[in-house]
């Protein structure tokens, strides 16, 4: 009975971690879109208006990933850096967060997504 409960507990824990990873990956879809839009906004020759428009769209796209990142964090607290970094974009330019977000999403998309 104890062995069965231990195995059941381990299986349930791994299911939760899988769900957290799925949520983190879902969030990273928005992160990647936002980073691509931010990169487009940095191209030479854009008007200031077009640059601001792309940056605004990038921020909006990034913030769409907040709920999935929060869901991942609720299941597995090790995804808190992803959620926190996304939320920082409201105060810190996305360009300054790009390296951290890219690294976190690389981890989420890896075969061994552990922080």
Give residue spans per PLM region:
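Bacterial N-terminal signal peptides
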Residues: 2-10
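Residue-level signal for mature regions of secreted extracellular proteins and peptides
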Residues: 8, 20-21, 97-99
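Non-transmembrane, amphipathic alpha-helical segments
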Residues: 20-23, 47, 51-54, 89-93
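Post-signal peptide N-terminal segment of mature Sec-exported envelope proteins
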Residues: 23-44, 103
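Extracytosolic low-complexity repeat regions of secreted or lipid-anchored proteins
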Residues: 29, 54-115
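Secondary-structure edge/capping motif, primarily at the C-terminal ends of alpha-helices
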Residues: 38-49, 73, 86-89
